[in-house]
């Protein structure tokens, strides 16, 4: 885990993110074929999965997105992942794809799309599920339900994918770094790294995205001034000028939207 003390559940570290090629039909085309009433404001999905508890009386996840997101060119009903049928664990035979938003909006094992005249109120759309306080809140303070907002576009974030944390590096050898960055509905305009705990930053080479909602690859190399313990921090900035914070951002009940700078440890010898 990258948290201390570690959170419960799967310790995915940096393994809970990927960028895939999806093939399908635009959700917009399907909805327009069926007809969209002027009163439509949201879509919701129902799927073939069951509640994690196995209790048939409990509703499984049923989330949704506003119509403006549902009608984007990139929002799909997908049947292929990286050129092959979607694997069962990823939602075969059909999956909703709402890129740039929480993955829970991209429902697996899709069997029904609802067009709603109100915000969808399915399972995991209310309470603290995928919702955060609308205004900054002191840690642990109660938040009225009316003051909780549904998470939409994900914040700017980057990862160092090479090397792994904890390596040894010889002082005389430059260290190659690389990773990925993304910014929800926005694009990434810059990535920088620091080896002195944020006192100074070195700009990285940033590759363009293959499309509007795909992640971007970055790379650079660093040299160290002396032997000892170092941390490498990565910080991305989006096209609206927002950068990753160096500490965990504002508190929320479930710990969502933590886009603090990723960091790795290096022992220079």
Describe every region a protein language model picked out.
Residues 1-269:
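Structured, non-membrane catalytic/scaffold regions adjacent to prosthetic-group chemistry
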């Amino acid at each position: 885990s990258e948290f201390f003390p570690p959170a419960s559940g799967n310790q995915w570290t940096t393994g809970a993110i990927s960028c895939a090629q999806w093939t399908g039909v635009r959700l917009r085309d399907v909805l327009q074929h069926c007809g969209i009433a002027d009163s439509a404001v949201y879509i919701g999905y129902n799927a073939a999965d069951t509640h994690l508890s196995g209790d048939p009386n409990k509703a499984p996840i049923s989330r949704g997105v506003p119509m403006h997101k549902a009608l984007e060119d990139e929002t799909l009903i997908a049947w292929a992942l990286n050129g092959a049928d979607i694997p069962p664990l990823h939602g075969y035979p059909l999956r909703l794809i709402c890129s740039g938003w929480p993955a829970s909006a991209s429902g697996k094992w899709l069997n029904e799309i609802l067009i709603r005249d109100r915000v969808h109120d399915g399972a995991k759309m209310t309470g603290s599920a995928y919702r955060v306080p609308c205004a900054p809140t002191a840690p642990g303070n109660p938040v009225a339900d009316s003051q909780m907002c549904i998470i939409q576009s994900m914040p700017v974030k980057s990862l160092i994918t090479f090397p792994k944390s904890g390596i040894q590096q010889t002082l005389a050898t430059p260290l190659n770094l690389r990773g990925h960055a993304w910014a929800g509905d926005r694009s990434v305009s810059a990535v920088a790294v620091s080896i002195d705990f944020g006192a100074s930053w070195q700009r990285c080479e940033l590759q363009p995205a293959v499309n509007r909602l795909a992640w971007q690859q970055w790379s650079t190399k660093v040299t160290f001034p002396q032997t000892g313990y170092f941390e490498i921090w990565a910080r991305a900035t989006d096209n609206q000028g927002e950068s990753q914070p160096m500490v965990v951002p504002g508190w929320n009940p479930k710990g969502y939207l933590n886009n603090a700078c990723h960091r790795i440890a290096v022992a220079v010898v």
